[in-house]
């Protein structure tokens, strides 16, 4: 049951990313995508121990890929915040820090 729930969550995250990929490349879209990637990294890292040994390397790779994608998207966001009004830029940067923190936490969980 747990793996079925995880599978459905991963499919939902994939669907969200697919929708975002089709949208304009606004800062908000990049933030949403970064947050979704951070969620995916967390999902993969947290469920790695429950996987059969043969599938653990794939979950670890998924964690690293999702975390790296989060960081790459945040670089794009940070380069665009100068075009936003002050309040929007501040909230965007808070979301960016949250996404990076969550992605980094997921990667650190792999080593513990």
Where are these regions (language model features)?
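Conserved, well-structured ligand/cofactor-binding cores
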Residues: 1-112
């Amino acid at each position: 049951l747990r793996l079925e729930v995880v599978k459905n969550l991963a499919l939902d995250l994939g669907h969200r990313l697919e929708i975002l990929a089709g949208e304009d490349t606004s800062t908000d879209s990049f933030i949403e995508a970064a947050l979704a990637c951070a969620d995916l990294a967390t999902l993969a890292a947290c469920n790695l121990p429950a996987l059969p040994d043969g599938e653990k390397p794939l979950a670890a790779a998924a964690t690293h890929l999702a975390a790296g994608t989060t960081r790459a998207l945040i670089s794009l966001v940070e380069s665009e915040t100068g075009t936003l009004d002050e309040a929007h830029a501040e909230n965007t940067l808070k979301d960016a820090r949250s996404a990076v923190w969550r992605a980094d936490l997921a990667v650190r969980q792999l080593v513990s």
